[in-house]
Amino acid sequence: MARTNTKNASVWKDGFLFVGNHLALDFLNTQPVQDGEAMELLPDFASLLGWFQTAGLLSPRDVEDLKRHWGQSAEARRTVEAMRGLRERLRKEILTWEDGGTPQYSTIDELNQLMAAYPMCARLRRRNRKQLLTELYFKRQRPEDLFAPLAQAAAMLFANANHDRVRKCDQCVLHFVDTSKKGTRRWCSMQLCGNRQKVATYAGRRRSASVER
């Protein structure tokens, strides 16, 4: 998996990758690998807020408010560490789940506790003068409130997604939900890994043809 350049810039958004087709997997993908080294895309609270904003979970005003009140706090640092810990536990569970296993009871309990402590709430608002709609939201008062959408997303992934369609890229550590009609997607994205694999396959065929001559 190569980082941003002219060819693959379209799959990066504000320094983050959104190729998972699911919020929980996009969160998992905040630690990609480049040249054999893990890249930490959530090194601090500002980066975490940036990811939430790019994912459409926080508005610019939300980000500024949280930065102003909590940016340099111990609570913000603890939240970042806790988020990264959750990410690694989910990574292990999702790898097992993709192979047909089931999440451990400890993970189920952790997600239930997070959803109870930091719930997603529903509210009614106007779509236009004649129509109403409901939308989900979460409190944005403290750093740990950010667990709300992530815990729900992980729970929804395990409960509703077809694990046969949730995969790790053949060429890197990124995960995705395969939404293709045939269910044959193998790469995180064509720009990042698909084209590279096709070039390698083509080069291999050319080498084989040269040897046979």
Role assignments for model-derived ranges:
Residues 178-179, 199:
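Short, non-ligating residues that shape and space the ligands of small metal-coordination modules
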Residues 166, 185, 190, 196:
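Residues immediately within or flanking Cys/His clusters that coordinate Zn2+
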Residues 203-213:
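Contiguous alpha-helical segments
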Residues 173, 189-194, 203:
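Cys/His-coordinated zinc-binding microdomains
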Residues 1-168, 212:
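Short helix-coil boundary/hinge micro-motifs
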Residues 168, 198-201:
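Residue-level recognition of specific faces of alpha-helices
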Residues 168-177:
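Acidic interhelical loop/turn segments
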